Every structure is written in structure tokens, then in C-alpha cells.
UniProtKB/Swiss-Prot annotation:
Name the UniProt record assigns to this protein: Homeotic protein knotted-1
Family matches, as Pfam families: ELK, Homeobox_KN, KNOX1, KNOX2
Residue ranges, compositional bias (Basic residues): 16-31
Record-annotated ELK domain positions: 242-262
Record keywords, A-Z: Cell junction, Cytoplasm, DNA-binding, Homeobox, Nucleus, RNA-binding, Transcription, Transcription regulation
Organism (species): Zea mays
GN (gene name): KN-1
GO molecular function, one term: DNA-binding transcription factor activity, RNA polymerase II-specific
Assembly, per entry: Forms homodimers. Binds to MBP2C; this interaction reduces RNA binding capacity.
Lineage, highest ranks first: Eukaryota, Viridiplantae, Streptophyta, Embryophyta, Tracheophyta
Subcellular location: Nucleus; Cell junction, Plasmodesma; Cytoplasm
Expressing tissues: Expressed in apical meristems of vegetative and floral stems as well as in the underlying ground meristem. Specifically expressed in vascular bundles developing both in the leaf and stem. Very low levels of expression in leaves.
């Protein structure tokens, strides 16, 4: 802000950095350039200036409280924007430029960029405004443009480079200011749209809870009044099916991974009851020698729904905990050691190294 102000030859404020210190700059500068800092500050109500060369009575009284004192709507008699352009601070009566205010306003109004400046100013005031207010501001800009064209006619404005630069710089500031105002509003709207989308994804069959509740209460009222008009009923089964389908579609990946994880944990724990019953039945029938062949293991796996690893682990644990060779089997094994140190029994080869199955 200060860089732009200094660019147009405007010095420091009459109030210095310390109390009681005053700095006066006598180099040449233009009064309108000192108002750059006023664009982002609230504008105080300005009294109408009598006898202006061009009066812009473009704002009618509104229903808002203090409408005539609202700087946003103070465009009549060159208020609001013009005062911001002319006065960054209230000029004192002793100011050598106080008498030039009307001439400065006339130059600003007659400048070719005035309508662009006014449009940018009104765009700032449209941010967050209700639709009716935004529409009214657009009408104001159109009315001002029409009045400006009528008042100026075909007259060419006098060329004044420093005023041209000021109008361009002021317009650029207003555009940037509008962007700064719009950004948080857009972020808030985007956040609300995401929340609304998430809530809609959880709604049932696209109907809001309010509609469902209102339908239910209407049915109760109709039944209590004895009327015969049939109201639409909520198909609970259909709603449940649609909700189930929606949830399965949304969480199918998560459920699949969870199912696999539970399946792994299930394999590490106890076997299903029916599978255990079938294995115990086979165990009872072959208690004397509970060593199933590979063919028998495959058959047991198919009938129980278990895999071969589970079958093998079950028999190993079962033999360790619940089986000991009978006396007859023990004597046969011992006799085998004394003769050939090995013998065959039920297709098994037994020696001092343990039990082995042939082929």
C-alpha cells in the first residue's frame, strides 16, 4: 500500500512515528493518490456535497437499517467510492486541497476507467451478499454507466498520466481485494458441499429422514380421523435390501479383507464342531493304529472341509495327548528290534529311527 502511495508522490502522514513529531512533505503530489489505503477500510458516512458538477443519484432508499449511512450504497452525490478515492483521511479546512474535491471527483467520474473501477468496487460488495442485494448492485452499475455515457457524450477526457496510473492501480487493488474476500467463502461452500454429499450417500433410497417421518405421522393422523384415503407406505423390506446393497457396495473391499483375516485366525483356533466329530469318529475306528494313509487324509479333508495341514496337525496333537501303543503293539515293536531291528506292520516300516510309511 505504501509503495503505491509513494509512487504517486504522497509522503508520510502528518503524524510521525512518535507523539508530537510532525513531518511535512512539500514535494508535488496529487490528492487522489493518498486514498489508496482507504479501499480496504470501512468508509464512514459522508455528508452530501452540494453543487457537484455531476450528481449520481443512483441509489434509492432500501429496507436495510441505516441504508443512507451505509458506505456500500453511498453512491449518490459521489459518496462511497468517490469519497474513498478523494479522501484517505478527512481533509482539514486549512488543507490547500479541500477546495479541489469537487474538481477531483469530476475528473474521476469523467475518466474512461471510472466504470471499471465502480464495477470492481461493487463486485467486492457482492461477495457473500444475498441474491437480491447482488442484483441491485448490478443494476446500480448499469445505471451509473448509462448516466456516465449520457453526461460525457462524445467528449474525450483530458489525458493525465498520473491519474491514469492511479485509476489502474486502484482497480487492481479492488480486484485483488475481492479475491481475498471470495477465497474463504468458496472454501466454506466447498466444505458444506462435501458434508452434504456425505450425508446424501448415507440417506435411504434418496429420501430424507424428515420425509419418512412425515409420511408415518400422516398415516397415523389419517387412521385416527377415520379417513379412507390410502397414503403411500414405506416398504421396510425394500428399504433394508437397498441399504444392504449400498453398504455391501461401499464396504465390500473392507469386508473381504476382514473375512480373510478372520479365516486365518479361525484356522489357528479350534476346528469346526462337525469336522472334529468326523475326525474323532475315524480316530475311534482306528484307535489301535491312528495313522491315516495319504488317501484317507484326502478323504477326511474333503468330508470335513479342512486342508491337509489341519488334518496332519490334528492327528499329531491327538496322538501326543490321547494315544499310547497297546501292550501287544509294544511287544511286537520290541521283538522286531531283537530280530531284524525292523519289521512291517499295516504298511508301515518300523525301526529304531521311528515310523515310516512305504511309498
Amino acid at each position: 500500500m505504501e509503495e503505491i502511495t509513494q509512487h504517486f508522490g504522497v509522503g508520510a502522514s502528518s503524524h510521525g512515528h512518535g507523539h508530537g513529531q510532525h513531518h511535512h512533505h512539500h514535494h508535488h503530489h496529487h490528492p487522489w493518490a493518498s486514498s489508496l489505503s482507504a479501499v480496504v477500510a470501512p468508509l464512514p458516512p459522508q455528508p452530501p456535497s452540494a453543487g457537484l458538477p455531476l450528481t449520481l443519484n443512483t441509489v434509492a432508499a432500501t429496507g436495510n437499517s441505516g441504508g443512507s449511512g451505509n458506505p456500500v450504497l453511498q453512491l449518490a452525490n459521489g459518496g462511497g467510492l468517490l469519497d474513498a478515492c478523494v479522501k484517505a483521511k478527512e481533509p482539514s479546512s486549512s488543507s490547500p486541497y479541500a477546495g479541489d474535491v469537487e474538481a477531483i471527483k469530476a475528473k474521476i467520474i469523467s475518466h474512461p476507467h471510472y466504470y471499471s473501477l465502480l464495477t470492481a468496487y461493487l463486485e467486492c460488495n457482492k461477495v457473500g451478499a444475498p441474491p437480491e442485494v447482488s442484483a441491485r448492485l448490478t443494476e446500480i452499475a448499469q445505471e451509473v454507466e448509462a448516466r456516465q455515457r449520457t453526461a460525457l457524450g462524445g467528449l474525450a477526457a483530458a489525458t493525465e498520466p498520473e491519474l491514469d496510473q492511479f485509476m489502474e492501480a486502484y482497480h487492481e487493488m479492488l480486484v485483488k481485494f475481492r479475491e481475498e474476500l471470495t477465497r474463504p467463502l468458496q472454501e466454506a461452500m466447498e466444505f458444506m458441499r462435501r458434508v452434504e454429499s456425505q450425508l446424501n450417500s448415507l440417506s435411504i433410497s434418496g429420501r430424507s429422514l424428515r420425509n419418512i417421518l412425515s409420511s408415518g405421522s400422516s398415516e397415523e393422523d389419517q387412521e385416527g380421523s377415520g379417513g379412507e384415503t390410502e397414503l403411500p407406505e414405506v416398504d421396510a423390506h425394500g428399504v433394508d435390501q437397498e441399504l444392504k446393497h449400498h453398504l455391501l457396495k461401499k464396504y465390500s473391499g473392507y469386508l473381504s479383507s476382514l473375512k480373510q483375516e478372520l479365516s486365518k485366525k479361525k484356522k489357528k483356533g479350534k476346528l469346526p464342531k462337525e469336522a472334529r466329530q468326523q475326525l474323532l469318529s475315524w480316530w475311534d475306528q482306528h484307535y489301535k493304529w491312528p495313522y491315516p494313509s495319504e488317501t484317507q487324509k484326502v478323504a477326511l479333508a474333503e468330508s470335513t472341509g479342512l486342508d491337509l495341514k489341519q488334518i496332519n496337525n490334528w492327528f499329531i496333537n491327538q496322538r501326543k495327548r490321547h494315544w499310547k501303543p497297546s501292550e501287544e503293539m509294544h511287544h511286537l515293536m520290541m521283538d522286531g528290534y531283537h530280530t531284524t531291528n525292523a519289521f512291517y506292520m499295516d504298511g508301515h516300516f518300523i525301526n529304531d529311527g521311528g515310523l515310516y510309511r512305504l511309498g
